[in-house]
Amino acid sequence: IGMLQNPTIMEFAQFLITVEAGKSSDDSQDFDSPLNIIADIPEGGKTMKVFFPGGIGFLQQFNSLFQILVGNPNRTEGIAAFNYTEDREYLNSGEKEHIVTVGRRYADLLISSGYKQFKLIGYCMGGLLAIETARALLEAGCNVYPVVTIDTIPIVLEMEGDLLMERSYGLMIGADVSKAGHVKSDNLVQQALELLKDKDNGYITENAIFNLSGELEELANCYKKQKGFSKKERLDKLKSAIPENNMQLSRDDLKRFDELFECYKRNYRCAINYIPKPFAGELRAMSCIDENSPFVPVMKPGTEDFLKKCALSNLQVVP
């Protein structure tokens, strides 16, 4: 019943917390904590499995996986996750050393929650946070299994303006971006990024996009037209392009649609500024079967070299 009444994982997780606490969410002092306990460690278990989402910040990326893990009758591990969009301190902190600073604070939250043994899994930018959290946990004497990163790619492209970031955001939340006026073809975007990525030290200006020609002229014309709308108008169109049966966003998320975009954009900039430092723990690097990315597919082949800059110990790349 709880899952039916609370269709997204965040709503369902809060429902579980409310039931276990025996009080309403309005009375819960932990409501604003970025650490969400999806399922506590079963009796006899020792390990908390902790998930870190990508740049979008919330946990709907893990919906299906959480349901499978929680429903496993032989489960011996707890399941938790960090939701950046619930973390006011995260949203208000500076960008310099952001990922390192947040990783240390998240390690403190895990330790103060009473857990001692961890498996950390991070998707995309969340992989960087998982590494920094693991670093702090190891320094504190905790037992940390090999950190799993999924599509944690080096971010080297910096954009002028928001046009392509808005398209990427729309794809991440399940919007039909073509209905919002964006170019539909991912391949077209990939070709444009491939062409522009080595110019101006990876900084892509809006004029560079507008001046694309030949088979990329469709993309140039699309974004010249998009530029004629205000940012608010573009985001409203993107919001309207989300299907009614979409399971990516909760009702509260929709109310914060523009704010979540700013969080997404900010996380991207923080990832650009991240400099890998030697990490004494073990790493397992995984990639999604779907090799297409809604934004930076041309960067994906650099994943292994990027993580090698971190790994002092064992780095295993899982094909």
Each model region followed by its residue ranges:
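Short, Lys/Arg-enriched alpha-helical microdomains
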Residues: 9-11
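Phosphopantetheinylated carrier protein domains
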Residues: 1-7
